[in-house]
Design a protein with these regions (language model features):
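Gram-positive cell-envelope targeting signals
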Residues: 3, 17-19, 35, 60, ...
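Extracellular fibronectin type III
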Residues: 24-43, 123-141
Length: 141
């Protein structure tokens, strides 16, 4: 069996899972072992279309329980991301900045993908999120 949870953007979550099975003949439920805790957050992100001299404008919303964001860029939506910036969270409600290079290379005309991976804090420890959010932006001449 399974149960799902409602997830809100810009919120950090800590979860664990276990399998359970209910025998219909005797109505008895059997439970498996709990997994280790996992951590994730789904940040709100937008990548704005811009020209290649200005780069890509990225806007992030501050999330509850999120301590920093790692920002990466790629020409491919699924792989090849290169880290370009780390954003530490403060008291601001949102963060806006320009990315002018893809790693060490300047942007060329085309579609780029911006990936944001949050780091979440629970107790005294900080964990990298299991989930990243990706937004696309088109760079023109």
């Amino acid at each position: 069996g399974y149960e799902s949870m409602n997830v809100s953007k810009d919120m950090a979550y800590k979860y664990r899972a276990r399998y359970y099975y209910t025998n219909r003949s005797n109505n008895q439920t059997y439970y498996g072992r709990w997994s280790n805790y996992r951590y994730f957050a789904m940040p709100s992100i937008s990548g704005k279309t811009t020209n290649k001299k200005k780069g890509i404008k990225v806007v992030l919303k501050k999330g509850t329980g999120i301590k920093q964001y790692t920002v990466s860029v790629s020409k491919n939506s699924k792989s090849g991301f290169k880290k370009v910036k780390t954003v530490k969270v403060s008291k601001k409600k949102s963060y806006s900045f320009q990315i002018t290079k893809n790693g060490k290379k300047k942007f060329k005309k085309g579609t780029y993908y911006v990936q944001v991976t949050p780091k979440v804090k629970f107790g005294n420890k900080t964990y990298s999120s299991d989930v990243s959010t990706v937004a696309s932006a088109y760079v023109y001449k």
